[in-house]
Amino acid sequence: MKKYLIIAFLLMALVTSCVSTRNTIRNIDDTAIMPPLSKEKTFIVTEISSDKKYGYDQDYPVNLGFLPITIAEMNVKRFFGALSGPEGQQITYTKVDSCCPFPSKKNDMGAGILDIYEVTWEGLATPKRIYINLYEKGKVIAPHGFGIRQIVP
């Protein structure tokens, strides 16, 4: 019996330690609306961030939580499809990690996580790491140092 109690206690401690008790994300905006889509099914992004933390810092991720989490991944493709390198270079992106659990009412589990993507383009010496939040909403703009791809609305 003691053995089961110890195992149950350890499991409970593990589960509760995985989620931060407070949300540190600073740029959530529940009133934000999903950007319009181009004919190519990418977001139409019209602004580049002047904030050097936007997208690069876990407290200021790109918030793409406009769809149910089960299909929200398509917003990643829509977002990166709207971006270019600073001189119009084509970008490539790869999901490399997930991190930074935070409390969220947008998930049955009561928590969300951030996904980390490495982005590169021709001439870029070191890939850029961009934090993406698929659970919460926010204004969608290009991170500092990126360009906006010329697309047909």
Give a label for each model feature:
Residues 61-98:
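Short, non-transmembrane alpha-helical segments in secretory-pathway proteins
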Residues 1-4:
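Positively charged n-region of N-terminal signal peptides that target proteins for export
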Residues 27-46:
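Post-signal peptide N-terminal segment of mature Sec-exported envelope proteins
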Residues 41-68:
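Post-signal-peptide N-terminal segment of Sec-exported extracytoplasmic proteins
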Residues 6-10:
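Sec-dependent N-terminal signal peptides
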Residues 15-17:
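C-terminal motif of bacterial Sec signal peptides marking the signal peptidase cleavage site
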Residues 106-151:
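Short, compact, well-ordered microdomains
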Residues 19-22:
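Bacterial signal peptide processing site
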